Amino acid sequence: MSAKIKSGDDVIVLTGKDKGKIGKVIKVIARDAKKKVIVSGVNVHKRHTKPKAGSSGGILNKELAIDISNVATLDPKYKTPTRVGFKVIDGRKVRFAKVSGEVID
């Protein structure tokens, strides 16, 4: 089965403290029924690390995963949230934005 959101997609956050932020999907985590995504610049937390051999330690900013239902793919033409559909073009199954009909990949 094809995924509606993939790594590298531009998405907008629909709910939560980062509502309205736009970012690129870094990673899709699909474990069991809980699908999550890591989006650049969204849900950033500070991680305190101790110094070890080879690294100095300190405070690092790290993006944490958010639920896939809290993001929507951006339409490539209008830059608005859109649902994703599938259609076959020249024997290839492709994703398209339902708002504008533009092919996403």
From Swiss-Prot:
Alphabetized Pfam families for the sequence: ribosomal_L24 (PF17136)
GO CC annotations on file: ribonucleoprotein complex; ribosome
GO function terms (MF aspect): rRNA binding; structural constituent of ribosome
Disulfide bonds: none
SMART domains: KOW (SM00739)
Gene3D superfamilies, per the entry: 2.30.30.30
Highest taxon of the lineage: Bacteria
Summary of the function given for this chain in its UniProt record: One of two assembly initiator proteins, it binds directly to the 5'-end of the 23S rRNA, where it nucleates assembly of the 50S subunit.
Quaternary structure, from the entry: Part of the 50S ribosomal subunit.
Protein family (similarity comment): Belongs to the universal ribosomal protein uL24 family.
Protein name in UniProt: Large ribosomal subunit protein uL24
